[in-house]
């Protein structure tokens, strides 16, 4: 029974190479891609889609085959009874094989996506009304979701120019401690870090633990981009993997949605190694698994079990785009730090005279590039913009040309 919906998967060895299928502009416009048609210029002219966190690539053939097989098998109703155990096992095995984290399948819970998991954590596990700490710049919903549950947000702007990281970004641990002293009950961690592209090192995670452990607080660790580490010299380390004292205060959320470009089919996994925290979760979240999409979950299983060869090629494409941008911006006043992970990149325009418009508005109106407004990722970042580089090489070139044309 557990093979249903997966029977069409091609079997690749780790040495196999697959071809990544890139979508053309015309295809993306014709299909009404939100990324490419959701933002136009003020006069209605089309833009280059660089704002939504998805890739301009077809998903892995293994994933597509699994989803097509599920449709052929009629798996369009409610979740089959074997689905949650199967995704739990695939998630645990992937975490162990890819990152060395020895997760047991019994510690994995199926949810629709990372954001509902965050909402459930805030609503049910955090003390009512206490502040939520968000290191910034941050994924936009992290700054808005706490307010839906009557929790104020404490933004902690991150540090630049540390000795260890050069121009890279680092958590402001003293700022986080100050927020915890003020009564905060949760720290939202994003690793790899959207939008700055940092992959946090083990010593950074241990230093964060030393701060959080002094207080009655939890960590929500969003690891949705963990499979997209671009710098092969930087290992990904999950915060909760570092020991029982880490796991005891951590809700870890991950998914295949970003790494295999299936975000429109909601399916994510919460990992809870700590038994006491897992029991608290199960009291209120037992039914959350029903919100996960069956087709998306089967796609995630295929991604975790058979999708790594395809993803290696995807990361090569993204790295090539990053190389292009890094070279092009090297002698310009634009602040760009090469991402260690994720295809989302963070561009600073503080040293550029763009006139009265924000960077994102200027990019849209003058370069016809749709990017994210920096101020939506943190109050201190009005002079920044987030740009997605998971695109065809020619699109990356056009983004660079458009940006350089503003100088």
Show the residue positions of the predicted features:
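PLP-dependent enzyme catalytic core of the Aspartate aminotransferase-like
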Residues: 8, 93, 177, 353-355, ...
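N-terminal small-domain helix-loop-helix segment of the aminotransferase-like
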Residues: 15-113, 120, 303-306, 407
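A structural alpha-helix within SAM-dependent methyltransferase catalytic domains
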Residues: 68, 177-181, 209, 213-216, ...
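Conserved core of the PLP fold type I
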Residues: 76-210, 227-228, 234-245, 251
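Helix C-cap/helix->beta junction micro-motif
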Residues: 149, 214-215, 246, 332, ...
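Conserved core segment of the aminotransferase class I/II
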Residues: 244-319, 407
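Conserved glycine-rich beta-strand-loop-beta hairpin in the small C-terminal domain of fold type I
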Residues: 301, 318-326, 336-349, 381
């Amino acid at each position: 029974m557990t093979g249903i919906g997966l029977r069409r998967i091609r079997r690749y060895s780790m040495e196999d190479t697959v071809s990544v299928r890139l979508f053309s502009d015309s295809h993306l416009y014709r299909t009404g891609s939100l990324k490419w048609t959701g933002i136009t210029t003020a006069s209605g002219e089309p833009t280059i889609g660089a704002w939504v966190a998805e890739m301009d690539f077809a998903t892995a053939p293994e994933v597509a085959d699994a989803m097509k097989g599920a449709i052929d098998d009629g798996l369009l109703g409610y979740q089959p009874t074997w689905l949650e155990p199967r995704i739990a096992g695939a998630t645990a095995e992937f975490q162990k094989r890819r990152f060395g984290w020895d997760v047991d399948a019994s510690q994995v819970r199926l949810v629709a996506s990372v954001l509902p998991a965050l909402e459930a954590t805030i609503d049910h596990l955090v003390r009512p009304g206490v502040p939520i700490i968000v290191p910034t710049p941050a994924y936009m919903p992290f700054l808005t979701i706490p307010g839906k549950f009557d929790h104020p947000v404490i933004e902690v702007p991150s540090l630049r120019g540390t000795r260890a990281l050069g121009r890279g970004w680092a958590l402001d641990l003293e700022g986080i401690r100050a927020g915890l002293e003020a009564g905060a009950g949760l720290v939202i961690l994003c690793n790899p870090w959207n939008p700055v592209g940092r992959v946090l090192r083990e010593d950074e995670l241990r230093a964060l633990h030393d701060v959080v452990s002094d207080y009655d607080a939890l960590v929500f660790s969003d690891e949705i981009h963990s499979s997209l580490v671009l710098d092969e010299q930087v290992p990904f380390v999950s915060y909760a993997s570092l020991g029982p004292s880490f796991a005891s205060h951590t809700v870890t959320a991950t998914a295949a949605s970003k790494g295999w470009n299936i975000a429109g089919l909601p399916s994510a996994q919460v990992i809870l190694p700590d038994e006491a925290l897992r029991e608290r979760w199960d009291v209120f979240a037992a039914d959350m698994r029903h919100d996960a999409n069956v087709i998306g979950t089967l796609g995630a299983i295929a991604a975790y079990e058979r999708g790594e060869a395809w993803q290696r090629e995807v990361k090569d494409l993204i790295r090539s785009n990053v190389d292009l941008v890094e070279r092009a911006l090297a002698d310009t006043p634009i602040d760009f730090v090469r991402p260690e992970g994720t295809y989302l990149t963070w561009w600073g325009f503080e040293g550029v005279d763009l006139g009265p418009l924000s960077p994102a508005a200027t990019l849209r109106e003058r370069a016809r590039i749709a990017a994210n407004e920096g101020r939506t990722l943190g109050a201190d970042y009005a002079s920044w913009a987030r740009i997605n580089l998971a695109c065809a090489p020619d699109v990356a070139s056009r983004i660079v040309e458009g940006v350089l044309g503003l100088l």
